[in-house]
């Protein structure tokens, strides 16, 4: 079965097994990968895991995601846990889709955590 993934969607993924401090378990993940790669059915996908273990004022390491559609709990995006996963780890979705205004905040947080200078 071919997944029809879209940039900015949130899907449920099985992130086990893990190593060290990696986020594990079955949990929602934000699809961060470029839409052209998704459309080409690339076998892996760049994601950001979510957690319901909320921490206040933790930007840029975390961004709060409000419940919507089938994402039923308030969550934090774990910006410092960005990783690529095999598409076989994606098990259900989309749970919801993030609006462009929120994704702009995600891009800024990712750039800051990764040390990209967007001002240049």
In which residue ranges do the predicted regions lie?
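Compact nucleic-acid interaction/catalytic patches
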Residues: 22-26, 30-67
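Short linear motifs in intrinsically disordered
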Residues: 1-3, 54-55
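C-terminal terminal-subdomain/extension
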Residues: 3, 67-120
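Short, charged beta-turn/beta-strand-edge "cap" motif at the junction between a beta-strand
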Residues: 16-20
